[in-house]
A protein has these predicted regions:
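Adenine nucleotide-associated cytosolic modules
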Residues: 1-386
Length: 386
């Protein structure tokens, strides 16, 4: 059972998404608190009054004094809610790693009060839904603040030029993964925005003919939850250059260069794939951690064994873009996979691939696969030399 600490002040606050039973009588003996998966019954005549004070503003002692209820009762209820993962207990503020702070003390002191800062107010409103995800991670007690702060320090590179890649780029930026960038794959056939790039809502007809990468980077400052000033603007303000993230993830969308993937494997870079399979199927995964999980070549060899040929070629005129509804779904699923790995270090896509059938998109299938005996991805260096 989870118990409250007596050394650190506790400021109880219900997690975003916990619902409370409606009051049906002025003489209640208990209330029920629940989510869609489980619930807790609090048996106390003043349970509703106590829960109403769980806003993160007052400490346990202050709530006890305000209501005239023994501190032991307050802590007992807190312990029940902590055991159900219904409660946050820490007060923290988001650290904006890339928000400019003047080196001049008088100006720095002036900017500390952000109550009238329209940009900061907008950030708070956009941040609330993201915090409501992070707060539910097991063990999180600060409302998801540390989770969101950590996202700013994680680097993601998306390699691709499809609508799915553009959508994924915008989702990760809007989710607080500030250090997300998009790189064109070696198969990129047009450096400018063309008709096939439209339809996702990210790029418009007025963008046709513009440099694709430059235009997407311009829009990134609108999409990003934590916008980053341009390098030129930072230099003008005398701000330090952004620090290159220590943790990184590569997401390969669409066709890819096998030599580039070999480079990722050799250098130990985590990566996963998003693409299209033959027929009416889109795929998310596998997620590859070099030296620990089967790689993309393992999957290719397994598929070749099943089909009976080493490789299938794509006929001329075949569109490699996904239907727009599927593109949105696949981008969202890929973003979920990336965010879970960033937030927790875990993913269900290791040695697995998520299959999304265009004609049965409401039933994605997670298919697992083993290492292929002919693939050397998990061999030791001594085995390779032999």
């Amino acid at each position: 059972m989870t118990t409250t600490s007596t050394s650190t002040p506790i400021f109880p606050r219900l997690k975003n998404g916990v619902f409370i039973s409606a009051q049906t009588s002025t003489q209640e003996s208990s209330i029920t608190m629940a989510t869609s998966s489980h619930g807790v019954a609090i048996n106390h005549s003043s349970a509703r009054s106590i829960i109403e004070q769980f806003t993160g503003i007052l400490s346990c002692e202050e709530i006890s004094q305000k209501l005239g209820i023994p501190i032991t009762t307050i802590k007992s209820i807190i312990d029940e809610l902590l055991a159900a993962n219904f409660l946050d207990t820490q007060r923290k503020t988001i650290k904006l790693n890339n928000r400019f702070q003047s080196a001049i003390k008088s100006r720095a002191a002036h900017t500390q009060d952000q109550s009238n800062d329209a940009a900061f107010s907008q950030l708070q409103k956009r941040l609330a839904p993201e915090l409501s995800r992070g707060t539910w991670i097991q063990g999180v007690r600060d409302g998801g603040v540390d989770v969101m702060t950590a996202r700013q320090n994680f680097g993601v590179e998306i390699i691709g030029n499809s609508r799915t890649a553009t959508l994924l780029f915008s989702i990760l930026l809007a989710s607080g993964v500030t250090n997300t960038r998009i790189s064109l794959s070696t198969s990129y056939k047009h450096p400018t925005v063309v008709d096939s790039d439209l339809g996702s809502g990210s790029l418009r007809t007025t963008d046709l003919g513009l440099n694709y990468k430059k235009r997407v980077e311009e829009l990134a400052r609108e999409w990003s939850l934590f916008p980053v000033a341009s390098s030129f603007a930072l230099a003008q303000r005398g701000a330090p250059k952004p620090v290159v993230p220590e943790k990184n993830l590569r997401i390969i969308c669409g066709s890819f260069d096998s030599q580039y993937v070999e480079h990722l494997l050799r250098d130990g870079h985590d990566h996963f794939f998003v693409g299209r399979a033959p027929g009416h199927v889109a795929t998310v995964g596998p997620f590859v951690q070099p030296g620990s999980t089967p790689c993309r070549r393992c999957l290719s060899l397994i598929q070749a064994d099943r089909v009976g040929v080493a490789e299938l070629s794509i006929p001329l005129g075949t569109s490699d873009e996904l239907p727009i509804a599927v593109a949105h779904q696949v981008a969202a699923l890929a973003a979920h996979a990336a965010l879970k790995f960033i937030d927790t270090g875990k993913t269900e896509l290791q040695a697995a691939q998520l299959i999304v059938d265009f004609l049965d998109a409401l039933n994605p299938q997670l298919q697992h696969f083993p290492q292929h005996p002919e693939c050397e991805c998990l061999w030791t260096r001594a085995d390779v030399l032999l």
